[in-house]
């Protein structure tokens, strides 16, 4: 949070018009607040970003804003509203220099699981060609963790052991890969 606050302070010290990228910093602070389970503060930061206007955001800001708001809606229990925002985000996404390590379709699959729409979540995994035997990479780690969640939901729905065993093996492999890659956030 401190990094965002320092960057905002420096941006404001420049004087003149609001610098491009300022709105993105508010979106980032919103995500930190949401992670801390301070949903009112997270919402305020997003509204501040919106008040600044689209011209103060970088090209991906419209996409990131909707993903951030969707995650707030999900935390509030508004799964339908979250899904609508993710659909908007998916339409607005434009690739850039940064890899998309948390793709919207994976976020939507997680929402589908939460809504009890296991068939749709399994369909997502099939469309993406995901398997518990895949070679693991950081770029697809979020998708594989989502696959594990889908398998656990399948186990809960069907009561058969196979999805549980597959999810366990996949999570063990993901843990080893994260530890070897020193990705503490993934390990947690």
Predicted regions and their residues:
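Helix-coil-helix junctions within alpha-helical repeat/solenoid scaffolds
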Residues: 1-188
């Amino acid at each position: 949070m401190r990094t965002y606050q320092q960057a905002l302070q420096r941006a404001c010290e420049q004087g003149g018009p609001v610098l491009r990228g300022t709105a993105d910093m508010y979106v980032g602070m919103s995500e930190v607040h949401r992670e801390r389970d301070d949903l009112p503060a997270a919402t305020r930061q997003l509204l501040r970003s919106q008040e600044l206007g689209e011209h103060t955001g970088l090209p991906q800001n419209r996409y990131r804003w909707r993903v951030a708001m969707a995650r707030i809606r999900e935390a509030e229990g508004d799964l339908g509203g979250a899904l609508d925002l993710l659909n908007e985000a998916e339409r607005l996404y434009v690739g850039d220099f940064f890899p998309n390590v948390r793709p919207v379709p994976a976020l939507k699959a997680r929402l589908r699981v939460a809504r009890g729409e296991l068939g749709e979540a399994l369909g997502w995994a099939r469309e993406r060609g995901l398997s518990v035997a895949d070679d693991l990479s950081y770029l697809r780690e979020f998708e594989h963790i989502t696959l594990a969640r889908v398998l656990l939901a399948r186990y809960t729905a069907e009561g058969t052991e196979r999805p549980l065993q597959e999810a366990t093996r996949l999570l063990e492999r993901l843990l080893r890969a994260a530890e070897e890659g020193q990705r503490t956030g993934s390990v947690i």
